């Protein structure tokens, strides 16, 4: 099982755009997302890495991606962002079986849901998703598939208040379970890559039994 020690950064307020520089200043290391769990059917592995830190009340995450084509068709939050060039952060903040999936495409459109597994997930209301500040090097305007090698970056500030089935005021000292993924279901070459390995016979990111550890 992979494990990351998530460093705490003492900062009163930070925008998503400021996150890359803040993580660099605090020497936060990047972690590769490189597990091709279904190599026979989906062998393609884009380059992806992420750095993560936390503050008193939020996660700060920065993704760096290089892939052979890009797509950002989803128009609004909670649309089918996983069909686009998508980076995903799954996290179980309370150890009660519930986990949140925060899926964001390369244009900063995201999906936020909660549940115990793939089925019967509850999506966040718009007033919740808008609390997640996003910044991307590709801008915020949706676009159709571009079949050209592209490098892009995405930063998210995820306040604990978006974990809407919980009342979390602090995660200091906690050990959480979660995973990070890169996918693109409707790209010319679909792919399903993970930070922590997954042992299911077919692509499935909703597998908390294969989550890694995040130590805060």
Where do the model's predicted regions map?
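Structural preference for beta-rich elements and adjacent junctions enriched in aromatics
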Residues: 1-216
């Amino acid at each position: 099982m992979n494990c990351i020690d998530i460093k705490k950064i003492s900062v009163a307020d930070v925008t998503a755009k400021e996150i890359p520089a803040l993580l660099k200043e605090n020497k936060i290391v990047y972690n590769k997302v490189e597990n091709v769990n279904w190599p026979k059917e989906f062998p393609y592995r884009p380059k992806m890495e992420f750095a993560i830190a936390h503050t008193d009340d939020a996660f700060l995450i920065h993704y760096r991606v290089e892939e052979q084509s890009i797509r950002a068709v989803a128009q609004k939050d909670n649309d089918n962002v996983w069909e686009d060039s998508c980076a995903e952060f799954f996290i179980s903040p309370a150890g009660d079986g519930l986990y949140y999936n925060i899926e964001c495409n390369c244009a900063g459109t995201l999906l936020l849901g909660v549940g115990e597994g793939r089925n019967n997930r509850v999506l966040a209301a718009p007033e919740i998703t808008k609390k997640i500040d996003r910044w991307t090097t590709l801008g915020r305007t949706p676009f159709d598939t571009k079949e050209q090698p592209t490098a892009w970056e995405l930063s998210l500030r995820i306040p604990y208040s978006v974990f809407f089935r919980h009342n979390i005021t602090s995660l200091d000292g906690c050990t959480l379970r979660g995973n990070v993924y890169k996918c693109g279901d409707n790209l010319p070459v679909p792919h399903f890559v993970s930070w922590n390995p997954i042992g299911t016979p077919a692509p499935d990111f909703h597998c908390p039994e294969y989550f890694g550890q995040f130590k805060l």
